[in-house]
Amino acid sequence: MGENLFVGMAKGLRTWLESQHFVPLVTDVFLMLLAVVGVLAFLFLNALFLIYYDRKFGAWVQARLGPNRVGPRGIFQTVADTVKLFAKEIFIPNNVDRWPYLLAPVLIFTIPVMLFLVIPFGKGMVPYDLNLGVLYLVAITSVETIVLWMAGWSSNNKYSLLGAMRSVAQMLSYEMPVILAMLSVVMMAGSMKLSDIVAAQQKVWFIFLQPVGFLIYFIAVNAEFKRTPFDLVEGESEIISGPYTEYSGMNFALFFLAEYTNFMIGAIMVTTLFLGGWNAPFGWTFIPSWLWFIIKMYFVITLYMWTRWTFLRIRIDQMLNFAWKFLLPVSLANIFITGFGLYLYRMIRW
């Protein structure tokens, strides 16, 4: 029942619309819009919970209480902060480049929402199952570099510009290890379709076949999405808030929401590419596939939070050296070893 709940609801709705003699195009568009609304609801609710969970986890690591005033155990603190940001005035400084300045917050939030449209959340639960899903993810995430540069440059602030320059250097440096780690998974699965990659892990998860690729991807994605120890783009002790320094009110809230949405996307991609996606471990199929997906996602999120609250921020030169002098060569070596291993495997099978 739980396994087919959402899929059954979608099929039932499609059957009902067709019985009402709706044009097939109208039916498809309506169901796609419904899927987008569902993705947005999932995104907002998880982002609200993630902010609270991150604060509570950090408090536990540092032996303090964390949010504890608004609601039982502070569970409504994130809601209160959201209302506060909604109520704040959106102040636009005089010397900003107005249109790029206003467009950047909208685009920075749109990018992760677009990524959610190709994620296989469960068996048969993919809003849009692209044949080139991996390529789509790489292409869309690359746009974030341009958006952060827009925000920093248009703000006409030295701290914002410095943060934007750091973001470009950081994201370009760690883009190659991310792509190469994803390529090793594509080689194993023989497909760029995310649902095919999940299906290829039905017997063995790729974390066991690609342990080096997993570590590379885990580290590089953390750097791509600017989480500690790679949070140099908005290092509070150095450049205030980086590209977000001149933003206030709802504009700042969009940047903040995009940060946690990207955080969620990183955990989702680790789950999809290396932890079997919605596949159940130990044959425990009595738990719905979408619930397994969420459990794995939050396990990876907890690992990322652990690194955030236990590691120190590194310097920009250390971060770039680590990407170009260590991660990239190891990523290339992993690709060659994967290719050679697949060649030997096929030779033995012959």
UniProtKB/Swiss-Prot annotation:
UniProt keywords, alphabetically: Cell membrane, Membrane, NAD, Quinone, Translocase, Transmembrane, Transmembrane helix, Ubiquinone
Q: Which PROSITE patterns match?
A: COMPLEX1_ND1_2
Spell out the coiled coil positions from the record. none
Q: Where is it chiefly localized?
A: membrane
Q: Which GO terms describe its molecular function?
A: NADH dehydrogenase activity; oxidoreductase activity, acting on NAD(P)H, quinone or similar compound as acceptor; quinone binding
Pfam families with a match to the protein in the record: NADHdh
What would be one Gene Ontology cellular-component term for the protein? Answer: plasma membrane
Q: Provide the E.C. number(s) assigned to this enzyme.
A: 7.1.1.-
Localisation: Cell membrane
Q: How does it sit in the membrane?
A: Multi-pass membrane protein
| Family that this chain belongs to | Belongs to the complex I subunit 1 family.
Q: What PANTHER family does this protein map onto?
A: NADH DEHYDROGENASE SUBUNIT 1 (PTHR11432), NADH-UBIQUINONE OXIDOREDUCTASE CHAIN 1 (PTHR11432:SF3)
Subunit structure comment from the entry: NDH-1 is composed of 14 different subunits. Subunits NuoA, H, J, K, L, M, N constitute the membrane sector of the complex.
Instruction: Relate the protein's function as given in its record.
Output: NDH-1 shuttles electrons from NADH, via FMN and iron-sulfur (Fe-S) centers, to quinones in the respiratory chain. The immediate electron acceptor for the enzyme in this species is believed to be ubiquinone. Couples the redox reaction to proton translocation (for every two electrons transferred, four hydrogen ions are translocated across the cytoplasmic membrane), and thus conserves the redox energy in a proton gradient. This subunit may bind ubiquinone.
NCBIfam families membership: PRK06076.1-2
Q: What is this protein called?
A: NADH-quinone oxidoreductase subunit H
Please tell me the species this chain comes from: Carboxydothermus hydrogenoformans (strain ATCC BAA-161 / DSM 6008 / Z-2901)
What is the name of the gene encoding this protein?
Answer: nuoH
